[in-house]
Amino acid sequence: MGGKSGWQALESNPETINPFLKKIGVSGVECVDVYSFEDDLLQFLPQPQLALILCFPSSEAREFLSKQYEEVEKNGTKPEGVFFMNQNEDIGNACGTFALFHSLANLEDRLNLGKGKFFKWFEKAKLVKEDERSDLLSEDTDLAEAHDETAEDGDTEQSDQVDFHFITYVNKNGKLYEIDSCAPFPRPLGATSDSSLVKDASVAIKELMENVQNLSFSAMALIGK
C-alpha cells in the first residue's frame, strides 16, 4: 500500500517470504501459494493451516472493508487478546510485512520464533501499548535491514505508489480473525481449525472479491511444519 518512503514493498510470493522468515529467525512455518478458493482445490492444501495472507487492490476495497468494521463496532464485538498494531506511515509500503508479523505474533504458541530479529522486537512490542508498537517497529534497524534486503532480492521494480494492500486471516485459539493494519481493530469471523482455515477465510474473501471490480487478488497460506 502506498505511503511515505521507508521500508520497501515485499513481493507476495513464497519465494520471497520463506527466505525472509529465515532471516528474521522464525521456523516451524512456511508459505505456500493459494491459487483458488474453490472447495475442490482447497482440499489439496497442506495442513496445519495457521494463517492466510491476502493481497488485493487497496483503493477499490477500502470503502467496503470500512463498512464491515463499522458493523463490528456497532455490535460491540471488538475482540480482546489479539496482538494488533496500526501501520506506521514512516515505514511506508510494508503492509505485507505487517500482515506477516500480525500472523506470527498471534501464532507465537504454534511456531518457533527463535531468538532472532523478530523475537527480539516482539518481546518488546508485547510490553508496550497498541499504538506504540509500529513506532517500535519503525525504529528496529535489524528488521528493517532484513526486510529491505529481501525486497531488493525480488524481481518487481520498487515504487513509492503501491496500490495493493495485505491483510491476514489467523487462527487464534480456534477462532478466525481478519487483521488489517489499516483497520481500527481485528475483526472476528467465527470458529476455525487447522484443517479448514483457508476455506473459512474464503467466505469473507469471496464477499470482498464480489464487491471489488478488480481481479488482482493473490493469497498465501502459512502452513505449520
Residue ranges, per PLM feature:
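Cysteine-dependent deubiquitinase/ubiquitin-like isopeptidase catalytic cores across multiple families
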Residues: 1-225
